[in-house]
Amino acid sequence: MSLLLTVFLIVFVTQLISWIGQNVLLEWAYNLYLRLSRNSLAARQRSLKTEILNNKTELLKTSAQDQFAKWAKLRRSVDKGLAELEKLNSEIATAKSSFSTKFNAVIWALTSGVNLVIGWWYGRKAVFYLPEGWMGPLTWWFSFPFAPRGSVSVGVWSFACKRVLLVLERMVKELFFAETQAKEVPVGFSPSSSSSSTPNPMSKASSGSPSPRRRTTVTVESEDEKS
């Protein structure tokens, strides 16, 4: 496998882990580990939960007054099961914490660790060469820090791959967000049409009742006629 493709795959795997989320991968890996190893603690936890649930159901059906002996026995069984379950959960949490430490170490070794080793081992080698005079005075930057002049170093190639993947990620997110917004807005909806169709209570009130000045004029005219 060429150095160019190797560096790209390492950067791609690193970004893929970042996109999915390391905590999500940890949960998947831990559940797979429990299934493959048939962990006795997990099996005991499932059976104990089922037993406690059955005892609680039976306890609710039992009267404490009419069947006190049976009720007390079920109550002691539920309390004992809950105490054992709490202890078991603590042991499982400790085991999961240990698994998480090992898993994170493996992920770091497969991504950042491998990237550092390749950058150090192939630091003086060229990933590929640029056409002569193509980049002008910036040619030295592409070979930074120790690659031959006129070539692209491992560090610069890794940086370029990461930037391209980040740009693609942003483009996909913007496209997905635009499609989501288009689905949420109803077809043919226009804020101006909705505002124009809404009746104005002030205009209705002004058209339905005379103004105070008009009322005063009418009252004065009627009093003059009487006199």
Swiss-Prot record:
Keyword list, A-Z: Coiled coil, Endoplasmic reticulum, Membrane, Transmembrane, Transmembrane helix, Transport
Subunit annotation: Interacts with GET3.
Q: Kindly give the InterPro entries that the UniProt entry links to this protein.
A: Get1, Get1_fungi, Helix_hairpin_bin_sf
On whether Transferase is a keyword of this UniProt record, the answer is: no
Organism encoding this protein? Coprinopsis cinerea (strain Okayama-7 / 130 / ATCC MYA-4618 / FGSC 9003)
Q: Which GO terms describe its cellular component?
A: endoplasmic reticulum membrane; GET complex
* Similarity section: Belongs to the WRB/GET1 family.
Name used for this protein in its record: Protein GET1
Give TM segment ranges.
4-23, 108-128, 152-168
Location relative to the cell: Endoplasmic reticulum membrane
The protein's GO terms of the molecular function aspect are: protein-membrane adaptor activity
Q: Which residues lie on this side of the membrane: Lumenal?
A: 1-3, 129-151
Q: Where is the composition biased (Low complexity)?
A: 190-211
Which PANTHER family does the protein's record reference? GUIDED ENTRY OF TAIL-ANCHORED PROTEINS FACTOR 1, TAIL-ANCHORED PROTEIN INSERTION RECEPTOR WRB
| Protein's membrane topology | Multi-pass membrane protein
**Source domain of life:** Eukaryota
Q: Which residues form a coiled coil?
A: 72-96
Topological domain, Cytoplasmic: which ranges?
24-107, 169-227
